[in-house]
Amino acid sequence: MFDIGVNLTSSQFEKDREQVVIRAKQAGVSGILITGTNAQESQQAMLLAQAYPDYCWSTAGVHPHDASQWNDAVAEQIHHMASADCVVAIGECGLDFNRNFSTPEEQERAFSAQLAIAAERSMPVFLHCRDAHSRFISFLTPWLNRLPAAVVHCFTGNRHELDECLAAGLMVGITGWVCDERRGLELRALLPHIPADRLLVETDAPYLLPRDLRPKPASRRNEPCYLPHIIRQIAEWRGEDATWLGQTTDENARRVFRLA
């Protein structure tokens, strides 16, 4: 089983990052993709991935929250990092109109620029979309035939949005959000509609600790070692065997990020 979304650069992991990776391995997690969300964190993610060869890989990009930072120097840094063997996708990039920490115009400019970098380098994109679906799809669609793959990370949309993502050929990342009995029920109902070969799984650690973990962890911090729990729950709600689903999503991740 492969965790396609871990924010291992987070300060929440500062004191025990090595132990977090060890616990993930002990739990049966076979690989981790470390998320880059701005130029500095993408650099940190790349260095962490290089510290754990053949177990950790990373993305390089600028999250929509940080899109106001986008300029030619940042673009050059992302280009440079993308040439490293351990950097396997451009992102986390996309649109987030929920809180607009960067203006929609700044987000769209950074998103378009990163799609262009991914197309130029023939790399997959690791995507973020929140409260911006129609604009997100309209921006992304013209680039899709020039990209080897596109992953919509931490999908929390509705049935119409899922159908549009699938029709566009996107891979769909599901997190422990689906384990939330308050907010995750709509997403849970959508799980059977995602073809097995388009499904990816992720913790988004240290965020989105599954609310149904028992016994409840002392800390609210999420970790990649909880990925098996998320997979077991997803498998149950899809009516599939958890071991098979873990293996299938692992194969999907290695195919999409060209790790096989």
Curated annotation (Swiss-Prot):
Primary localization class, coarse: cytoplasm
Keywords assigned: Cytoplasm, Exonuclease, Hydrolase, Magnesium, Metal-binding, Nuclease
Cysteine-cysteine disulfides: none
InterPro entries associated with the record: DNase_TatD-rel_CS, Exonuc_TatD, Metal_Hydrolase, TatD-like, TatD-type_Hydrolase
Needed cofactors: Mg(2+)
Listed SUPFAM superfamilies: Metallo-dependent hydrolases
Location relative to the cell: Cytoplasm
Binding site for a divalent metal cation: 92, 128, 153
Enzyme Commission number: 3.1.11.-, 3.1.13.-
Tree of life domain: Bacteria
Ribosomal protein found in the keyword field: no
Primary enzyme class: hydrolase
GO molecular function: 3'-5'-RNA exonuclease activity; magnesium ion binding; single-stranded DNA 3'-5' DNA exonuclease activity
GO cellular component terms attached to this protein's record: cytoplasm
Family as reported in the entry's similarity comment: Belongs to the metallo-dependent hydrolases superfamily. TatD-type hydrolase family. TatD subfamily.
Subunit structure: Monomer.
Described purpose of this protein according to its UniProt entry: 3'-5' exonuclease that prefers single-stranded DNA and RNA. May play a role in the H(2)O(2)-induced DNA damage repair.
Protein name listed in UniProt: 3'-5' ssDNA/RNA exonuclease TatD
Annotated organism of origin: Pectobacterium carotovorum subsp. carotovorum (strain PC1)
Species lineage: Bacteria, Pseudomonadati, Pseudomonadota, Gammaproteobacteria, Enterobacterales
Encoding gene per record: tatD
